[in-house]
């Protein structure tokens, strides 16, 4: 319990400055101990009511250290992992750093668990976090573009439409984000496989038929700047 409290304080930027990464220690314990101890640690993380990204850091740490353990936990400790996943995505900001952590878990998760995580992403990609889907998708196609193929059609369609909607709102001045989302779309198109890239372009075209946004022009402009664009 004290270990979790230290990790929570560190993730929230409070408490004594630790030289060690406490969330890494928590994920180490979960990965390297028996199921019962690991289960207790996850329970403690779930019970530590907090609005920082402790859950996300822990689940990302597990996925990087032991893919098999991650998927075993998602199957055998489903209720706990469901809570951990829900909390991890819900408390994630729309920063690229948090999106990268989510993408790391997706990359290492089996098909069912990956779809569950992306389902949470699309559920939480709203209001001030509207750009979350765009940033997670960008991170996935950068590191593991074929992973998109293992997602359900519903998850893929939701991610793509939310990505384009967020960029449209930004280009119309309705939202602020430190990242140019038209460039994010251009990067997704360039780095995705053909099927995903085509789907993004089709959705972009459909969206723009209903609006007078300069979004398409900005995306095309950014596409020409991409290294691998032909």
Task: Give the ranges of each region predicted by the language model.
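Non-catalytic all-alpha helical scaffold/repeat segments
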Residues: 1-230
């Amino acid at each position: 319990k004290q270990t979790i409290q230290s990790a929570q304080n560190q993730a929230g930027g409070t408490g004594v400055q630790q030289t060690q990464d406490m969330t890494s220690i928590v994920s180490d314990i979960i990965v390297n101990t028996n199921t019962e101890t690991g289960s207790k640690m996850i329970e403690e993380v779930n019970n530590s009511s907090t609005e920082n990204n402790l859950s996300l850091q822990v689940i990302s740490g597990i996925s990087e250290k032991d893919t098999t353990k991650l998927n075993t936990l998602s199957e055998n400790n489903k209720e706990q992992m469901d809570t951990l996943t829900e909390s991890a995505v819900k408390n994630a900001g729309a920063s690229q750093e948090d999106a990268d952590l989510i993408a790391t878990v997706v990359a290492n998760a089996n098909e069912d668990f990956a779809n569950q995580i992306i389902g949470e992403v699309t559920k939480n990609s709203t209001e001030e976090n509207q750009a979350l889907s765009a940033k997670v998708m960008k991170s996935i196609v950068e590191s593991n573009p074929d992973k998109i193929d293992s997602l359900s059609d519903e998850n893929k369609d939701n991610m793509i439409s939310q990505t384009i909607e967020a960029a449209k709102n930004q280009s119309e001045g309705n939202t602020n984000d430190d990242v140019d989302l038209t460039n994010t779309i251009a990067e997704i198109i360039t780095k995705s496989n053909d099927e995903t890239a085509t789907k993004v372009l089709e959705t972009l075209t459909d969206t723009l038929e209903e609006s007078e946004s300069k979004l398409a022009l900005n995306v095309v402009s950014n596409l020409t700047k991409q290294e691998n664009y032909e």
